[in-house]
Amino acid sequence: MVLSSADKNNVKACWGKIGSHAGEYGAEALERTFCSFPTTKTYFPHFDLSHGSAQVQAHGQKVADALTKAVVHINDLPNALSDLSDLHAYKLRVDPVNFKFLSHCLLVTLACHHPEEFTPAVHASLDKFFSAVSTVLTSKYR
């Protein structure tokens, strides 16, 4: 999916407003994913998946850091996320549908925390961005 210049601007502006809350939102989105899509828990058998768990918080920060890197390198997602794509495809073997689940939960989390900024245009841009990130992360599965 091609991101237009307006999409890129929307994503950068929204992510800029998230700022220091990115890790917190990443963890919240993970918790939402685990609750809404219980099969996603199978990839984390060694985690304490309870609300506020330090392990979920730490992984939420990793998710946020990866997305921040993607925002910074929005014009070159394949190169920016190549190592992460390798990890998920070859080592972790995460079912690609789980990226869609997490993307949905990220959208819900951002909408809850930033309702005024979460316009239909921003929603569409973020959805396209998360879809592009998911596509890159699953590109090495083939």
From Swiss-Prot:
Boundaries of every Globin domain copy: 2-142
A GO CC term attached to the entry: blood microparticle
Highest taxon of the lineage: Eukaryota
Role description: Involved in oxygen transport from the lung to the various peripheral tissues.
List of residues that carry Phosphoserine: 4, 36, 50, 103, 125, 139
Any matching Pfam family: Globin
Family: Belongs to the globin family.
SUPFAM superfamilies listed in its UniProt record: Globin-like (SSF46458)
Positions bound to O2: 59
Annotated residues for binding of heme b: 88
Gene Ontology biological process terms from the UniProt entry: hydrogen peroxide catabolic process
GO molecular function: haptoglobin binding; heme binding; iron ion binding; organic acid binding; oxygen binding; oxygen carrier activity; peroxidase activity
Tissue expression notes: Red blood cells.
Oligomeric form and interacting partners: Heterotetramer of two alpha chains and two beta chains.
Modified residues (N6-succinyllysine): 8, 12, 17, 41
Keywords: Acetylation, Heme, Iron, Metal-binding, Oxygen transport, Phosphoprotein, Transport
Species this chain originates from: Panthera leo (Lion)
Residues where Phosphothreonine is found: 109, 135, 138
PTM-bearing positions, type N6-acetyllysine: 17
Protein name in the entry: Hemoglobin subunit alpha
Modified residues (Phosphotyrosine): 25
